[in-house]
């Protein structure tokens, strides 16, 4: 078409579609949910897909993603809400601060975010934990940026690299990776990466941009928990990490027991992300609810409140899944896969690059993960011996790069930390880029020994 080969046309079509998606979201302020649907429809029509297949492909992608991630998001959000309102998140922060001391308080904030952020989306984790940044800064006298950047790094690293976060879980489903191995490798990569991008970079940049919180905002959100009867550190940690433990146990059972063994069959069910998070939520109803004196009405109200803010996130994720499926069904993914094989590009590097481009284009780490995985997955069949778990991590690392003005997280950080756009680029955007690049380096190093 237009004097081009079919493959070249498909690549150009995909490029034009993604540019159009950027323009719709950034220039015309179209909601990402609507913009993704329009982009998916445009790609389907212009790529030559049969009309009846266009809607079906989008529907399959939308439903396939939400049938899994929608449940994960709801359960994780409920768990996070109970943890925050019971004072569990505050207990983790207080305990780590006592353990690390004032001089190393920024390290404790990274670990607190790392632990608390496991069941939460970045934006939700940010809203739940930002009061702790203000409280700790006030108590310790340490710079807001020196404390805040490590917390943001911990949340972002978990968001992009560690299941049961929805982003990595989506990529696990697309690539057919093992969840237990991905958790293990994700932790190996995420901890040192967050340490470099968080406490180390935060200590450096805070010398030049210390951060001055809005007095009005501090007064509004930096209050102590309503109850001083906080759950213990051990109980909080056990509750939050229960789903991770169950998923790791499933992987152990898959390795240690043969197919058809009763224990393995049970662990396959119990260690499934949905089952694991459901069990953790049921435990949290007691540890973060009834044991703290909350009655059934209050718990029900908290759970209802937790679901309302996730509606937009769920719809955007679903539309991202539909767009991803359109890229696959139109043949764009196969074209890129064959190009990667012919150019002899490392699949890990390709996964990182594709996710990075989509992240910069759309501003959404989750959309970048979904779409990037869908584009790169054909490479698995073309290049034998590819480590699927590292592809998941590479896609997640790429999805974190260069957060800028088309990312809601950029404005969230700017407003809460009372920074100018320039300061936000020098702190938040730089931190996200360090996370992405350093994460890739660790993934490539890990690939040498796996």
From Swiss-Prot:
Key word Transmembrane present: yes
Subcellular location: Cell inner membrane
Topology term for the membrane: Multi-pass membrane protein
GO cellular component, one term: plasma membrane
Alphabetical UniProt keywords: Cell inner membrane, Cell membrane, Gluconate utilization, Membrane, Sugar transport, Transmembrane, Transmembrane helix, Transport
Pathway membership: Carbohydrate acid metabolism; D-gluconate degradation
Pfam families: GntP_permease (PF02447)
Ranges annotated as spanning the membrane: 6-26, 30-50, 60-80, 116-136, 142-162, 183-203, 233-253, 269-289, 312-332, 338-358, 366-386, 430-450
A single GO molecular function term of this UniProt record: gluconate transmembrane transporter activity
UniProt xrefs under InterPro entries: Glcn_transporter
Biological processes per GO annotation: D-gluconate metabolic process; gluconate transmembrane transport
Superkingdom of this protein's organism: Bacteria
Family designation: Belongs to the GntP permease family.
Name of this chain's protein: Gluconate permease
Record organism: Pseudomonas aeruginosa (strain ATCC 15692 / DSM 22644 / CIP 104116 / JCM 14847 / LMG 12228 / 1C / PRS 101 / PAO1)
Lineage of the organism: Bacteria, Pseudomonadati, Pseudomonadota, Gammaproteobacteria, Pseudomonadales
Name of the coding gene: gnuT
């Amino acid at each position: 078409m237009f004097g081009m080969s079919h493959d070249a046309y498909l690549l150009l079509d995909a490029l034009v579609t993604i540019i159009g998606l950027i323009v719709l979201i950034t220039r015309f302020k179209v909601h990402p949910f609507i913009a993704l649907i329009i982009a998916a429809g445009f790609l389907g029509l212009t790529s030559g897909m049969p009309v009846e297949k266009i809607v079906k492909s989008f529907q399959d992608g939308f439903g396939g993603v939400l049938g899994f991630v929608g449940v994960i998001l709801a359960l994780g959000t409920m768990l996070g809400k109970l943890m925050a309102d019971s004072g569990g998140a505050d207990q983790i922060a207080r305990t780590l601060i006592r353990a690390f001391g004032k001089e190393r308080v920024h390290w404790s904030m990274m670990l607190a975010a790392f632990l608390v952020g496991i069941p939460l989306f970045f934006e939700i984790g940010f809203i739940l934990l930002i009061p702790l940044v203000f409280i700790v800064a006030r108590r310790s006298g340490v710079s807001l940026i020196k404390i805040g950047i490590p917390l943001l790094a911990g949340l972002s690293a978990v968001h992009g690299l560690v299941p049961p976060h929805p982003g990595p879980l989506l990529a696990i489903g697309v690539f057919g990776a093992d969840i237990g191995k991905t958790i293990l490798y994700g932790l190996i990569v995420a901890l040192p990466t967050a340490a470099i991008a968080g406490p180390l970079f935060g200590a450096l940049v805070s010398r030049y941009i210390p951060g001055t919180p809005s007095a009005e905002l501090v007064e509004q959100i930096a209050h102590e928990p309503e109850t001083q009867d906080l759950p213990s550190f051990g109980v909080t940690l056990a509750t939050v990490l229960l789903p991770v433990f169950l998923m790791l146990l499933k992987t152990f059972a898959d390795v240690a027991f043969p197919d058809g063994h009763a224990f393995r069959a049970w662990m396959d069910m119990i260690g499934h992300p949905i089952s694991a998070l459901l069990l953790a939520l049921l435990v949290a109803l007691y540890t973060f609810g009834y044991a703290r004196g909350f009655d059934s009405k209050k718990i029900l109200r908290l759970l209802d409140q937790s679901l309302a803010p996730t509606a937009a996130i769920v719809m955007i994720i679903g539309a991202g899944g539909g767009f991803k499926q359109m890229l696959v069904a139109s043949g764009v993914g196969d074209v890129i896969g064959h190009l990667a094989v012919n150019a002899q590009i490392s699949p890990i590097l390709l996964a990182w690059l594709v996710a990075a481009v989509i992240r910069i284009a759309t501003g959404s780490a989750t959309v970048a993960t979904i779409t990037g995985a869908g584009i790169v997955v054909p490479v698995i069949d073309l290049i034998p011996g590819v480590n699927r778990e590292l592809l998941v991590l590479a896609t997640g690392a790429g999805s974190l790069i260069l957060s800028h003005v088309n990312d809601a997280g950029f404005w969230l950080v700017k407003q809460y930390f009372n920074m100018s756009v320039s300061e936000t680029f020098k702190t938040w955007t730089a931190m996200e880029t360090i996370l992405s690049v350093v994460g890739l380096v660790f993934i490539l190093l890990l690939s040498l020994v796996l």
